[in-house]
Curated annotation (Swiss-Prot):
Organs and tissues of expression: Expressed in brain, heart, lung, liver, spleen, kidney, testis, muscle, intestine and thymus.
Chain coiled-coil ranges: 69-160, 210-297, 329-403, 454-518
Gene this chain is encoded by: Ccdc154
Protein name in UniProt: Coiled-coil domain-containing protein 154
InterPro entries: CCDC154
Location of the protein in the cell: Early endosome
GO CC annotations, alphabetized: early endosome
């Protein structure tokens, strides 16, 4: 499966995606809190710069994904080259085996020719003895001596040829063993290189996990700083409000005679400004939410297209793997049938040779007996020479027997070699069938585990959007409650200010009456009213301070609750990634990013800048898939080094087809 490609340089784990979504949540929270800060203009620029962060992250993610795709394509090309090399090596071995068989056949034909020559040499002197008459006996003996010398030379020549043939066979066997050792060495070197690449990948993944942890720590520090800044701002605002109230009370005492119309105008202008600012902030937040939704929809479309492309690749690779398996089975059956036919032919030829040699020996013995009887009757005068001739004939018979024994030994050796080769072939076939059965069982079991695991992960991922929505709803509710409380407190304070104004107006009236009448009783009443007014002012100050402390406590408690909820959500996200995230390069173990993941295959990812889960393939799944491919290919290469090329085209349907269900 050439997947949303990546290589060791990229290692974009799903933790990056999760951090992006957390940053978006934090930006939304901070914007919701900062929207209350209407008096500070610098915060608008800060929010604008904060909104640019996800866009930069998305651009980086796409670049890294493109790099990953390029690296995966390069790896696919390298694996195809490896397949071609393995095919060339197997073809070379088959050619060499054919050459060896041709040599063996040539040697067998030469042995037959030599046997015919020996038989002719054995028959020719006996015929000449029958044809020759008595007076030509001396010439006959000379020719017999010459023939015996020629037979001996022919026997020595035959023995030399047999020794050369044995040496050639040994040399060819040594060459075959050397080439097999070279091939095994090459395969082991390639396995070591792959293991080194896996270790490098694992190190890079651990580095990325550390970077993610550092990023999360930074985010937590930023959240704490934001909480502290918000608490300080609220405290400053409350202090400003308190000072403003005190100044207003002093101004009320000093400006008793100023008109109330100016105050009403000022209050109305302030309210209008506040409402206009609130509307602007509301419009800005709505525009940002729309932009974020549009981005989320676009990214969901891209991810769906990628998933469809990957599904098509999986189907194509499964078909390709099945075709390869069918072709391999056909080739193996054809080879097995050819070998069985050759073995049967060789057995029949060996039986015919044995029968032919036995018949020839019997004929030679009968001819020798007849020749001895005729020579005894016809050549009584030449007993000494006949005795010498009989000794030479006996030696020749012994040499012929030795030659027949040697031929039998050679036939036995050939039979043994054929039997050993047949046993080796049967053992290898049985081992290969066992490997195929085990691999199929492992694949079936793995698919079952993957389906169960995918269901669990899908349930967990589906629960995440609900948690995020609940937190956002809590934030909105909290914001509305705070707004209601602030408005209620403002109304209560306005009511208290109006009561103070009424009391001050009553005091002014009483002062005017004093100026007009100056009675002692009214002075005492005014003094009592002033005392009550002072008490009310003290009570009002105490109530303001108590309200301030209560609000501070409530705000601190709410901020703590928010931080705890965010921390729990973050922990749940990290736990999910750690339990279900990407895996290590060694498929024997079931972890890849040791800090993040455990037994992870294909899950639903969360799209960037989105709150809804999307069915998409991530970089970590591609890495996992590549791991499975390499693991299975290494198993095939170890147990069957001559047929690795056929299994290299293995990717999920189960990698890609995993990498088939072995290759991209």
């Amino acid at each position: 499966m050439s997947e949303p490609a990546d290589g060791p340089s990229l290692r974009l784990s799903p933790s990056h995606l999760s951090t992006v979504t957390l940053e978006d949540l934090e930006l939304l929270l901070t914007e919701g809190l900062v929207s209350a800060e209407t008096s500070e203009r610098d915060e608008c620029s800060g929010r604008a710069s904060g909104s640019l962060v996800p866009e930069q992250d998305t651009s980086k993610l796409w670049k890294q994904l493109e790099q990953w795709v390029a690296e995966l394509q390069a790896e696919v090309v390298r694996l195809r080259g490896h397949k071609e090399r393995c095919e060339h090596a197997t073809l070379g071995l088959l050619r060499e085996l054919l050459q060896v068989r041709a040599r063996v056949q040539m040697q067998a034909s030469e042995l037959r020719q030599l046997r015919q020559v020996v038989q002719q040499a054995a028959w020719s002197p006996e015929k000449e003895e029958l044809e020759l008459s008595g007076p030509q006996s001396q010439n006959q003996m000379q020719t017999l001596d010459k023939r015996l010398v020629e037979v001996r030379e022919a026997l020595t020549h035959i023995r030399r040829k047999q020794a050369l043939q044995d040496s050639e066979r040994k040399h060819s066997e040594q060459e075959i063993n050397l080439r097999l050792t070279n091939l095994t060495g090459m395969l082991s070197q390639e396995e070591q290189g792959r293991e080194a690449a896996c270790s490098a990948l694992q190190k890079n993944q651990e580095d990325t996990s550390q970077k993610v942890d550092l990023g999360l720590a930074k985010m937590q520090a930023q959240m704490t700083k934001l909480n502290e800044e918000m608490s300080l701002r609220f405290l400053k605002r409350e202090a400003k409000l308190c000072s403003f109230l005190q100044k207003s009370f002093l101004a009320l005492e000093q400006r008793m005679k100023s008109s109330e119309s100016t105050r009403q105008i000022a209050e109305s202008s302030l309210r209008e400004e506040l409402e206009s600012r609130w509307q602007k902030l509301h419009e800005l937040t709505e525009e940002r939410l729309r932009a974020l939704r549009a981005q989320r929809e676009e990214e969901e479309g891209h991810l769906l297209e990628q998933c469809r492309g990957l599904d098509k690749a999986v189907v194509y690779l499964t078909k390709f793997v099945r075709q390869n398996q069918v072709s391999l089975n056909r080739v193996l059956m054809a080879e097995q049938k050819a070998r069985e036919a050759k073995v049967s032919l060789e057995e029949t030829q060996a039986g015919e040779l044995a029968s032919y040699v036995h018949e020839n020996l019997e004929a030679v013995q009968m001819a020798g007996k007849l020749a001895q009887q005729e020579t005894q009757d016809a050549l009584e005068l030449l007993q000494e020479k006949s005795q010498v001739l009989e000794g030479s004939v006996a030696g020749l018979d012994q040499q012929l027997k030795d030659l027949s024994d040697h031929c039998l030994a050679l036939s036995w050796r050939l039979d043994l070699q054929e039997q050993t080769l047949g046993l080796k072939l049967s053992q290898k076939q049985a081992a290969w069938e066992g490997m195929e059965r085990e691999s199929l069982k492992d694949l079936v079991q793995w698919l079952k585990e993957v389906t169960a695991h995918l269901e669990e992960v899908q349930e967990k991922v589906n629960s995440l959007p609900q948690q995020i929505e609940s937190i956002s709803n809590k934030c909105v509710i909290h914001k509305s409650e705070v707004d209601v409380k602030i408005s209620a407190e403002g109304k209560a304070r306005e009511f208290e200010v109006e009561t103070v104004r009424q009391e001050l107006a009553a005091l002014l009236m009483s002062v005017q009456l004093l100026k007009e009448e100056n009675p002692g009783r009214k002075i005492a009443e005014i003094q009592g009213q002033l005392a009550t007014f002072q008490k009310q002012m003290i009570k009002l100050e105490n109530s303001l301070q108590a309200n301030k402390t209560i609000q501070n406590l409530k705000f601190n408690n709410e901020t703590k609750l928010r931080t705890e909820e965010i921390a729990t959500l973050r922990e749940s996200m990290l736990r999910l990634w750690s339990e279900e995230g990407p895996w290590p390069l060694t498929l024997g173990s079931k972890r890849v990013f040791m800090s993040l993941v455990r037994q992870r295959f294909f899950i639903k990812d969360v799209a960037l800048d989105a709150m809804v889960s999307v069915n998409s393939w991530g970089v970590y799944q591609a890495v996992r898939w590549l791991r499975w491919k390499r693991f299975l290919l290494n198993l095939v290469a170890q147990k069957r080094p001559g047929v690795t090329s056929a299994m290299t085209q293995w990717k999920p349907a189960y990698e890609v087809t995993s990498l088939t269900v072995f290759q991209k």
